[in-house]
Amino acid sequence: MAGWIQAQQLQGDALRQMQVLYGQHFPIEVRHYLAQWIESQPWDAIDLDNPQDRGQATQLLEGLVQELQKKAEHQVGEDGFVLKIKLGHYATQLQNTYDRCPMELVRCIRHILYNEQRLVREANNCSSPAGVLVDAMSQKHLQINQTFEELRLITQDTESELKKLQQTQEYFIIQYQESLRIQAQFGQLAQLNPQERMSRETALQQKQVSLETWLQREAQTLQQYRVELVEKHQKTLQLLRKQQTIILDDELIQWKRGQQLAGNGGPPEGSLDVLQSWCEKLAEIIWQNRQQIRRAEHLCQQLPIPGPVEEMLAEVNATITDIISALVTSTFIIEKQPPQVLKTQTKFAATVRLLVGGKLNVHMNPPQVKATIISEQQAKSLLKNENTRNDYSGEILNNCCVMEYHQATGTLSAHFRNMSLKRIKRADRRGAESVTEEKFTVLFESQFSVGSNELVFQVKTLSLPVVVIVHGSQDHNATATVLWDNAFAEPGRVPFAVPDKVLWPQLCEALNMKFKAEVQSNRGLTKENLVFLAQKLFNRRSNHLEDYNSMSVSWSQFNRENLPGWNYTFWQWFDGVMEVLKKHHKPHWNDGAILGFVNKQQAHDLLINKPDGTFLLRFSDSEIGGITIAWKFDSPDRNLWNLKPFTTRDFSIRSLADRLGDLNYLIYVFPDRPKDEVFAKYYTPVLAKAVDGYVKPQIKQVVPEFVNASADAGANATYMDQAPSPVVCPQAHYNMYPPNPDPVLDQDGEFDLDETMDVARHVEELLRRPMDSLDPRLSPPAGLFTSARSSLS
């Protein structure tokens, strides 16, 4: 049957080619109704050139005709009347056509099957665009559709069997009434004369015996029909359960997992349309079978016959009710999750959807959905069916919404657009747990009436865990909790259990996913970047990523304990990197201009043999979200320089590209790319001269130690090329600084740009004032500009 199911999905020219294969010699209706039988016969085993195989071909012809006749006999009622005549006609037609040449039937069917398979194969390989299968699904998805076709045919078959049972029972009841009428006639015989009474009595007795014999035999037949029908329903329910398990426990759970990973920056979870179509097919077939079972129960009540059927029917009825209950409750899902970091007094949205809403007439009486926030412990109690009514952990405004049915898309959903968490009630914290580690969830509840109020279901679904914050400063640590939960939560967990330790490669995958999403870049974390992060986290020196693969990272290491020697956690440092890139440096990161994940020693090793003026940009160790410039310039004191880190605050004043453009002695971006080639397109255009006669001041980046170098470089572009040849200094010299520290260098020998920028801003303010109006009291301290060695252009 699988071949015919695939053939039915052909389109365009391929479909037309398939239709040409059929005609009076072999009607397409025969192929359709006997698909399973035809595909299970050994057509290829017959040698068309061997007369000895004629007998086997004749048997196949006879089998085909018998199957058609049997199929015709099973068609009952008004719907089946025309089909019954057609199938009977086709049986006679094929018998007459191939009776004398059964080998031609074999040749015909082999030709049809071969070309069907060819068309399907070509469509799957996309060799003929017009004949492409609609569905480019995976093999598993194809199997799901094949199972649906099998369920559809089985349900059709049980419907025919039920109608046959009903007609047989109705005729039985008529004959039973005739038996009662005969029984009544015996009572009237006393009014007749003896001779006539005897003659009449004998005839009635013969008729009664014959009828009772028929009734006994027919009662057994009816009972057999009932048992066979129930057994078929039992098999149908087994297949339904299996199909429902695949869709709800595999495909839907996989979609939910994708939704969870999307919260960490993974690919979008995808449309629900395919899942909804499967769930709707399930609902339709389940409901049809349930109605058939109820009609069978009614027939048994109408004509009770001792036996096991009533008990069997009660069992299958209970089973199918359980199946539909599981379907309805499992397909009430959250299509759009609420924010997982939820700030109080802030508007947020969410969308819930019922995937079977259009098929079970739920939309005829639109249900209302209510949203509440509950704690992790309350969620655990809820799943244990413990009484938690009205036990909430906060108050959500605008938390009720009526589900709406959208005719065009066939979706039943509720859109919460203006919810707001008014207040939150926190639980007692455990040990070192902070408020940003406490998890809550939004509970959505409703009541659905199915099938004209035949069944009523209480449905509930929980959102992904949310962390509630009251201030923006808590956002970073709350995001860490969400990241860890989304990445490492296991299917079917108790809310909201998550491993306390994970392997380093698992964390690498989560960090890379988050990094690419936050920075909005296809340039993720390289192997070298991950080695740097591992060294930072584990305080190890190995440069081989494989050495860290078996190492575990605990939640405490990730975002509870500070890194050794620093006043921040691993996550806080990494999050700072993402934030500064996201806000200011996405294009530079995508261009490969920011090396980023290197420390001072690594920067020294990379630059030491490069020409003077070669520089690289790396993420600061001492400043969260800081970026520093390391560059090569040979001088009597040292040959490697590190500028004090810039932060988001600095880049909001002047961009990285403009700052680099100000420093003329920075010539090559590591390893050897000309600076202007990389950054010129990001320089701020020079403003035109003011028309009011005033000269507009500018803030420019200046490094005091290199003021002269800047001036010379401005006059002579080859200044850096004329500098002394680089000398490879020992590492001890790399860490040594002049004995008299410069007043604008910090204790690590890095330039204090905050002071430099403050001076520049002060000078700009002075230049904007008329000279004769300056108050001497506002003049800067004597020697300030000299000591700072700043320059203003």
Swiss-Prot record:
PTM sites of type Phosphotyrosine: Y90, Y682, Y694
Keyword Repeat: no
Single GO molecular function: sequence-specific DNA binding
SH2 domain residues: 589-686
Gene3D superfamilies cross-referenced by the UniProt entry: EF-hand, SH2 domain, STAT transcription factor, all-alpha domain, STAT transcription factor, DNA-binding domain, STAT transcription factor, N-terminal domain
Keyword Transmembrane helix annotated: no
Residues with the Phosphoserine modification: S128, S779
Any GO BP annotation: mammary gland development
Record note on modification: ISGylated.
Subcellular location: Cytoplasm; Nucleus
Expression (tissue specificity): Expressed in heart, lung, and weakly in muscle.
Top-level division of the source organism's lineage: Eukaryota
Residue numbers spanned by region Disordered: 772-793
Alphabetized Pfam families for the sequence: SH2 (PF00017), STAT_alpha (PF01017), STAT_bind (PF02864), STAT_int (PF02865), STAT_linker (PF21354)
GO cellular component: cytoplasm; cytosol; nucleus; RNA polymerase II transcription regulator complex
Subunit structure: Forms a homodimer or a heterodimer with a related family member. Binds NR3C1. Interacts with NCOA1 and SOCS7. Interacts with ERBB4. Interacts with EBF4.
PANTHER family: SIGNAL TRANSDUCER AND ACTIVATOR OF TRANSCRIPTION
UniProt record similarity statement: Belongs to the transcription factor STAT family.
Role this protein plays: Carries out a dual function: signal transduction and activation of transcription. Mediates cellular responses to the cytokine KITLG/SCF and other growth factors. May mediate cellular responses to activated FGFR1, FGFR2, FGFR3 and FGFR4. Binds to the GAS element and activates PRL-induced transcription. Regulates the expression of milk proteins during lactation.
Protein name listed in UniProt: Signal transducer and activator of transcription 5A
Organism, as annotated: Rattus norvegicus (Rat)
Lineage: Eukaryota, Metazoa, Chordata, Craniata, Vertebrata
Protein's gene: Stat5a
